[in-house]
Amino acid sequence: MFASVGVHGPELSPTAALILDVLLLGAATLLLLQDKRMTRHQGVLLLSFVAVVAVLRVVMASLPNVQPVTVAVLLAGASLGARRGVAFAILVTMLSNSVLGDGYWTLFQAAGWSLIAAVGSRANLMEGDRLLLGRATMFAAVLALPFGLVTNMSLIGGGVGLAQLPALVWTGLPFDLSHALGNVVVMLWTGPLMLRMLLPVDVPDATAIPGVEADVQLV
């Protein structure tokens, strides 16, 4: 997965990079706005977790191909559904890349993590509110490989032709396997905690609590 070690595809002009960022941000915003079931509290929770995971990715950037984002987007898809999971994946990619480096590769990283979020929404990784840790760990490991394939596509056009892709994938396999191993460690270590951070806590309407409505009206 060369995109994580500084090898990237075509360089974008500032205007093209801005257009790409606007399109990605617009896609994430549209996905969230279309989700009529999402409450304001859930929206704040989602954006807060975006910030937490983005910071984690930046802090762990020195560890080759250890990607806490992969586990986070998989669990976001499993607990929040495909729409919110994909929006989460896009926003985390954009926010963390604003520090690590933004460019053409951002599109492919966002696409790879969005794919993982979509798979997570269909993978039956939860039983009620409980994480099926063994199943989730298996998916986290296996999905490192298609993520590596998607991100390697960002190299096409940057001096690399489509015919060279198989050799590129083979050469990058050790990076993808280290990503898979990292996903196993991150899932076993932090998976249940991440899920608790993602699951919304029922916050009752203040006016529905006996005695609160009168107090609110007096203020």
Task: Label each region the model flagged.
Residues 45, 69, 77, 85, ...:
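Generic hydrophobic alpha-helical membrane-segment signal
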Residues 2-75:
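Hydrophobic transmembrane alpha-helices
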Residues 38-46, 81-85, 194:
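Membrane-interfacial loop-to-transmembrane alpha-helix junctions, especially the N-terminal start
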Residues 1-21, 106-110, 118, 122-219:
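Membrane-embedded alpha-helical hairpins and interfacial helices in multi-pass inner-membrane proteins
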Residues 23-24, 43-48, 88, 92, ...:
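Short hydrophobic/aromatic-rich motifs at helix boundaries and adjacent loops
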Residues 49-121:
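Alpha-helical membrane segments and adjacent membrane-interface helices in multi-pass membrane proteins
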Residues 42, 62, 66, 81-82, ...:
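Hydrophobic alpha-helical segments, principally membrane-spanning helices and signal/leader peptides
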